[in-house]
Amino acid sequence: MSAILSNLENSMHKNKFWNNYRSFCNDLHQEEIDIDHFISLLPKIFKQIEKNALSYQIYDAVNKLSEFQPNKGIELFNKLIKIESKEVLTLIPSTLDGISKSNVGFNKFIEAEFLLENNLDELKKQGYAFLITLKEEELNQNQDFSGYIYNLIKTDIENRNTIFFSYIIRVLGKFIMVLPEADENLISLSKIDSQEVLYEITRLLSYELDYSNNLEIYEILLFNLKTIDPKYHNIISLLNHLVFQKFIIDSPELIDRFLKEWLLFDKKRAGEIIKFSNTFEELHSKNSNYFKKMVTSWLNADDPVFHKAISKLIMEAPHNEFKNLELDENYLGQLNYKEIQFIVIKIVGYIYFKELIRSSIFSILKVKIDDVDCVNFIKAIFNEYIVFNYPSTIEYLEEEKKKSSRKVQKVVNEIIEINKEYFEKINQLEFINEFNPSDKRLKIYNGIHQKEFQIKLKETTDNKHSFLNMCKNIQLRTGKGMFSKHEGIYTEKTEMSRIQSSAELPRGEFIDAIGQEKIRAIYRNYTREI
């Protein structure tokens, strides 16, 4: 019995398993092992390494074993094909590939055909998987085998043998320049609504297919993915982190177009656009010019699905990264008054953060400063909605005025003057005592709340499972300093500092909440005049 196999077997479900597993995979090709013993361990090994990043090492180990000890590899292959375990059968491609690298007389094409013509679906899958280990020149040099693969793939697609489609996509992707009709077959498969199939298409776009050399087929496959369901998280993750990353700088219009088509395919998806927030934020940080253009064009779109999507993306984005929202100057410069009015209305209807509302509308003012109608409408929006709800906007305008042209400064001064006068008059109004709450009623109200607070406090104190029982580090304060004791050791003393935060809530919500919501609802449902 081989020591390397015994050591691995004895460490199953123990802490030292992973050290033994790594050593086993590194040294397997040098060891004289009993294949039957090895095969009997494989189900246990696969169970142990399931969903672990090191799971690939067993495939590399079997590949090297078959290359350096081809007789063992052939014995292993002949016994693997009789196994029923799906996980264990996945070692077949690595085994065949390793044997083919050795100098023994071994016809891998015959063995591949044996697997591909097998009545057992699991063995046929491994036959397709083995094809991926071949090289383009091997298929070019063996036209008979290449023709055999072409006919087999065509038959499986026509017969809708869907269990093989994910493997077929990998084969077609690798040999797209070799196999006849590979493009057409990939396009056909990309139209199938199957998470497994669409994942393989996305994986192909991520790793195998080069956009610059396969531009037409790449775009067709990409836009066929517009059908993907928002619940296909693994596909969306590949799009966000691999596919779209290729286009953020040089071809952002592809991302823009894909997201539009994805939204229009099912307009109920507007709220699910947040699944692509990573791409949205990457565009904002790495290609701000196109980001501005994209946001501006979506706000100017007639279909409200784009307004809802932009609102969702912006509202859910990290607030520290989206303190301002400027729109695209070139795009805005080509618009007429009605189009500018439409965009401003949608900003007010769909965007809620004061920083984003005022900065986006102010960026429009700077571009359309020579259009009297646009200026008057924007002034009205500032006066009646933005400054009315957020008086601090006056301070914002004062700062922006310093960086603006004289024409813009003139308009800003008009807005500031009107609103300062308004707030001065508001502050001069006398309080009417009849509208003040009763002191007696307030006393009773506060007493009830105080009693409830005391009850809750007592319940928390008496609860043995209180959150405070989880606290292991006790903070100690001395003078102006603070230190703590952690695992029996006192930390260095640090000086305490004051933490303060403030927020400006919209005035209109306190004065007339229903009226404010009515304004936003009207603006959200506003349609462009024809």
Question: Where are the model-predicted features located?
Answer:
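Non-catalytic all-alpha helical scaffold/repeat segments
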Residues: 1-530
